[in-house]
């Protein structure tokens, strides 16, 4: 409702490549349909033999197409970022992505016994970063009845950390924040967000740009939706 998506669409040009990440599928359609001069595609699980949206997205990027997808696929693109496939893209994220969220909780005994001592997982002592061993990757189908496939998937994207030896936390990967020619996060209010605190913790340089005209327009629209009325029972008692 603030007009930032419309402003973004109006500023696309055919000289640059874009990967746009939006919160909802309806907004994916909006970017594809609204960008008349610059053609965008969206991932489709029926596009490839593999039959996943990730494979479709990876194929579009490999071919240098402008792509729009949801936040759901964002963290899955770590392998592409590390391989340098995003280096020619301007990455635009509509709304602040999740910086950290709980993935799973297990007892220290379970983690030590089934994951670490058996050689399926390595945990960095300083950062808590969780990495699967090649053994887990190779044997994942054989051990999926005991070891969490969800934990494996997150660990393979370098975004999983172990907190207090029991809580698995999914953290926004630094490699995605450093990928591409630029990374832009569009949000109504950046200050006070967890993302800024995270960027400062990582030591990454960033710049905050404000669109005063757009913000004032949003304030006026919001004010027009608010009606203030007296409650007679309260007013009469004052």
In which residue ranges do the predicted regions lie?
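Short, charged/polar "capping" segments at the starts of alpha-helices
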Residues: 27-31, 50, 192-194
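Signature of the SF2 helicase/ATPase Hel1-core->accessory helical subdomain module
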Residues: 73-206
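Conserved helicase/translocase motor-coupling segment
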Residues: 181-183, 188-238
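Short His-Asn-centered micro-motif
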Residues: 21-24, 68-71, 93-95, 185-188, ...
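Inter-Walker segment of RecA-like/P-loop motor cores
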Residues: 37-76
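Conserved Walker A/P-loop ATP-binding site and its immediately adjacent core
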Residues: 7-45, 72-73
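Conserved glycine(s) of the Walker
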Residues: 3-4
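Active-site regions of enzymes building and remodeling cell-envelope glycoconjugates
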Residues: 17-19, 34-45, 65-66, 81-83, ...
């Amino acid at each position: 409702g603030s007009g930032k998506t419309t402003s973004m669409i109006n500023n696309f040009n055919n000289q640059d490549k874009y990967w746009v990440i939006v919160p909802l599928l309806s907004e994916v359609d909006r970017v594809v349909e609204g960008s008349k001069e610059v053609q965008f595609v969206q991932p489709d699980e029926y596009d490839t033999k593999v039959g996943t949206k990730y494979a479709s997205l990876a194929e579009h990027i490999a071919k240098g197409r402008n792509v729009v997808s949801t936040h759901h696929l964002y963290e899955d693109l770590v392998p592409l970022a590390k391989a340098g496939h995003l280096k020619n893209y301007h990455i635009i994220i509509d709304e602040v992505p999740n910086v950290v969220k709980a993935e799973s909780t297990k007892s220290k005994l379970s983690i030590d016994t089934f994951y670490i001592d058996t050689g399926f997982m390595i945990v960095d002592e300083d950062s808590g970063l969780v990495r699967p061993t090649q053994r887990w990757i190779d044997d994942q189908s054989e051990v999926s009845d005991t070891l969490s496939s969800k934990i494996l998937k997150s660990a393979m994207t370098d975004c999983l950390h172990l907190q207090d030896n029991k809580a698995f936390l999914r953290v926004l990967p630094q490699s995605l924040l450093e990928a591409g020619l630029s990374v832009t996060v569009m949000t109504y209010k950046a200050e006070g967000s967890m993302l800024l605190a995270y960027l400062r913790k990582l030591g990454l340089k960033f710049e905050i740009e404000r669109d005063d005209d757009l913000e004032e327009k949003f304030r006026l629209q919001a004010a027009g939706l608010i009606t203030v009325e007296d409650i007679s029972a309260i007013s009469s008692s004052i």
